[in-house]
């Protein structure tokens, strides 16, 4: 049994991202949100214990552990004390067992936005994520990173970077001590080089290197060059570098489509005779190049580096991680 497919009779799917429709609670039913947050905190401990049993020591906490967190103060939640105690228990367990916890707030946290209202909500949201780690008992550090993107260049990378830095200075010291930036997956946005030259040089923040994103936005660097440029930004703080690895959902589905065509002797000229397969093919054609695959078949090139944390971004979550761990065991046996 895994956590993603846990049967309902055993409690159902484990997640740290339960939420609710805004209309179902706002503004007079904060208890509903409090209930969701407590369930999320309880499941975080379930995740950590399962990870320990399976040799997984890196975990990304759901960014909606406190649903709609920019609409209230955490201490206003009816179950705040109980939630705080549970989160501290989670942090204590993670520290005792050598687990690293991180989080990745959603794409609406945009410090470089030209719109004041977007920036204000972003500042609140980032502070809530930092407060979550505070409740877990963590000293502010890039070890428990809050990972975001610049999330838009607005036609002028340099001006947007300056706005981003200006608003970064408005964050609390604890939040700034956790906030890291990740390279983008669009050529018009921010590569590792752009992040390094336009932002890191001014505030010394670490850069999370995303292998797949680099293929879309290289900044005229090879993968190896970008990897080590990002690594330098972690080394200067004495914190283990964290990277992201994923594979192409489009390529994953392409292999399945090709097998389907071969097995049934289908071509694009005859696919209309197979309505079910035609629907599958049309869905395949809609998949964006940047989309993450459900699983990963390979592991990233770490260029001889031993001290490195790799977050595997795959839709199947721990179901995608287990086969990788099995492969590693086989290699150790060999």
Feature-to-residue mapping (PLM):
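Contiguous N-terminal and early-domain "leader" segments and peripheral loops that mark the onset or edge
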Residues: 126, 132-133, 143-154, 210
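Multi-pass alpha-helical transmembrane bundles in non-GPCR membrane proteins
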Residues: 150-152, 157-167, 179-183
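Short active-site loop/helix that positions an aromatic residue
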Residues: 215-219
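Alpha/beta catalytic barrel-like cores
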Residues: 1-100, 107-138, 142, 170, ...
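Short, structured patches in soluble enzyme cores that scaffold and shape functional sites
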Residues: 105, 147-152, 181-185, 209-211, ...
């Amino acid at each position: 049994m895994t956590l993603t497919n846990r049967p309902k009779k055993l409690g159902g799917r484990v997640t740290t991202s339960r939420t609710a429709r805004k209309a179902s609670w706002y503004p007079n039913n904060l208890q509903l949100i409090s209930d969701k947050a407590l369930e999320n905190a309880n499941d975080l401990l379930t995740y950590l214990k399962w990870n320990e049993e399976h040799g997984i020591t890196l975990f990304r906490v759901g960014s909606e552990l406190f649903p709609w967190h920019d609409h209230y103060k955490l201490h206003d939640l009816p179950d705040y004390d109980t939630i705080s105690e549970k989160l501290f228990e989670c942090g204590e367990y993670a520290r005792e067992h050598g687990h690293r916890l991180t989080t990745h707030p959603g794409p609406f946290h945009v410090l470089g936005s030209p719109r004041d209202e977007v920036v204000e909500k972003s500042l609140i949201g980032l502070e809530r994520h930092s407060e979550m780690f505070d409740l877990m008992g963590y000293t502010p550090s890039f070890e428990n990173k809050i990972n975001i993107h610049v999330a838009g260049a607005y036609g002028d990378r340099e001006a947007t970077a300056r706005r981003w830095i200006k608003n970064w200075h408005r964050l609390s010291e604890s939040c700034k001590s956790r906030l890291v930036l990740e390279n983008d997956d669009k050529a018009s946005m921010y590569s590792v080089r752009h992040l390094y030259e336009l932002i890191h040089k001014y505030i010394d923040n670490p850069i999370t290197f995303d292998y797949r994103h680099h293929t879309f936005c290289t900044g005229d660097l090879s993968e190896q060059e970008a990897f080590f440029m990002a690594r330098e930004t972690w080394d200067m703080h004495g914190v283990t570098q964290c990277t992201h690895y994923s594979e192409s959902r489009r390529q994953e589905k392409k292999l399945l489509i090709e097998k389907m065509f071969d097995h049934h002797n289908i071509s694009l000229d005859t696919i209309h005779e197979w309505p079910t397969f035609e629907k599958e093919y049309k869905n395949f054609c809609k998949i964006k190049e940047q989309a993450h695959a459900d699983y990963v078949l390979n592991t990233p090139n770490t260029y001889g580096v031993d001290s490195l944390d790799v977050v595997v971004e795959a839709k199947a979550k721990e179901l995608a991680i287990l086969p990788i761990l099995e492969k590693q065991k086989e290699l150790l046996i060999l």
